[in-house]
Amino acid sequence: MPWIQIKLNATNDNAEAIGDMLMEETGAVSVTFLDAKDTPVFEPLPGETRLWGDTDVVALYEADMDTSLILQQIKASNMLAEGFAHKVEQVEDKDWEREWMDNFHPMQFGRRLWICPSWREVPDPQAVNVMLDPGLAFGTGTHPTTALCLEWLDNLDLTGKTVIDFGCGSGILAIAAIKLGAAKVIGIDIDPQALLASKDNAARNGVEDQIEVYLPKDQPEGLVADVVVANILAGPLRELSPIIKGLLKPGGQLAMSGILDTQAESVAEFYRDDLELDPIAEKSEWCRISGRKLG
């Protein structure tokens, strides 16, 4: 059946509140946040919504809803300026899962590494192939932050090394590290669903014996590694900097992403005293901060 979609423009300060209002007061069946350049909002932490400064709020309604009444309710909420910009359109029902699967293709990162959906054939059987079914966890390689981390891993000599994937999501970085030569990877995530997805994808790639996953409260005491990769968010990267740096052996290498270009310097300041930092790498307004721990 067709649906009605209403798109509103908001800021990161009020977008989530507007989304709540649309769900609770106007009868929206779903609300999606996009940035104003139509880039999907990826990788929210549980209980936290990741938003850009200029955010579109997209609400979906059943086709028989009265759009004029909905717009009156939005106006009456006083959450948007007088004469607020909006777009109303009808969208056809789709098999969204099938459409997503059809558009998820094998992707190459760096010189050797391919990320391949588990339902497609690998394009190069001789390459380093990671077979992936992300399920409900973040991490497919399609987002610039994941791509930045995969390219960084591909450029390292991981032979025999221990790696920590801090915020492991689907396990894509952990599995890639094993496939690229690491002896062992420890995945840490606050979301139990991510740990399940990481385990499933590790088994799919035949590396389940080399990957351990933990909630932060369950990780082994004194855990340190040769390499740490943390593709999370700028806020946690700042707040958890003592913990993240503590996971790294002296001389070990660290890469962090999930950082917008406007946030990069503020994140780097939390690591500059303890690491020799590389030049910041950028891709589509997203950044990777990397370096080697001093000592």
Curated annotation (Swiss-Prot):
Q: Which GO terms describe its molecular function?
A: protein-lysine N-methyltransferase activity
Provide the binding site for S-adenosyl-L-methionine: T146, G167, D189, N231
Q: Which reaction does it catalyse?
A: L-lysyl-[protein] + 3 S-adenosyl-L-methionine = N(6),N(6),N(6)-trimethyl-L-lysyl-[protein] + 3 S-adenosyl-L-homocysteine + 3 H(+)
EC number per UniProt: 2.1.1.-
Task: Tell me which InterPro entries the record gives.
Answer: Ribosomal_L11_MeTrfase_PrmA, Ribosomal_PrmA_MeTrfase, SAM-dependent_MTases_sf
- State any GO CC term: cytosol
The protein's predominant localisation is cytoplasm
Q: Which UniProt keywords apply?
A: Cytoplasm, Methyltransferase, S-adenosyl-L-methionine, Transferase
Q: Name one Pfam family in it.
A: PrmA
GO terms in the biological process aspect are: methylation
Residues folding into a coiled coil are: none
Q: What does this protein do?
A: Methylates ribosomal protein L11.
Similarity annotation: Belongs to the methyltransferase superfamily. PrmA family.
Q: What is this protein called?
A: Ribosomal protein L11 methyltransferase
Q: What is the lineage of its organism?
A: Bacteria, Pseudomonadati, Pseudomonadota, Gammaproteobacteria, Vibrionales
